[in-house]
Amino acid sequence: MVSLRNELDLYIQELLSLQFKASNGITHNPTKGTLREKFIKQEVLNQYPALLLKSGILDDEGWQSSQVDFIWLKENARVGNFNVYELSDCKMFMEIKSSAKHSEFKDLNTVSEEIHRRAIEKNPEHHILTGMFCYSTEASEKTVLKKFGFKYDKELQGYLNYDAEKDIFKEIDFLVSLNISEDNEASPYMVKRDFFGNCVLYNNNPIINNFFNYFKAI
């Protein structure tokens, strides 16, 4: 039997998709992007009201990250008025994309590597989660998942077990894709990297609960 919590998570997941479609009528792209970013943040805060969520850049001894849409900070983090936050105060660094491109995955993988390296140098137990939340991707689902180590088998009509040798984005900890398409036949999916660095694929609805669980576990 499906739990009420799962039904509510599916409701939230559908709301995110509907908000994306509703905002498509806005022609000013920065405004459209801001609305989507705020909607995702609000849905996370609805689940965990005490979280400190920001957007901006991370700073660490002369190094700055790229501007990012979603930063989860520790409770006692220094905030200020300039959207600049100390790397040591960060718990999650997440890009939000309407239609993620291959180049954006590459850029995120590069900045993630630097974030992970710097965090561990200061504190071996401090792992900053880095990932992407996207509504869709320019490449097909099969192409994207192949780059995360999951090959689609036509005979089995499903994905094979994770293959680390095929994974080219080893610094990205997670990917959430609502996988919105014009025909509405595609299903959302999530890739999560485990403690050992291997990826796990979630494609049974609702997948959003796996994303929400990050904020509960850390």
PLM features: residue spans?
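Intrinsically disordered, low-complexity Ser/Thr/Pro/Gly-rich regulatory segments
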Residues: 1-67, 72-218
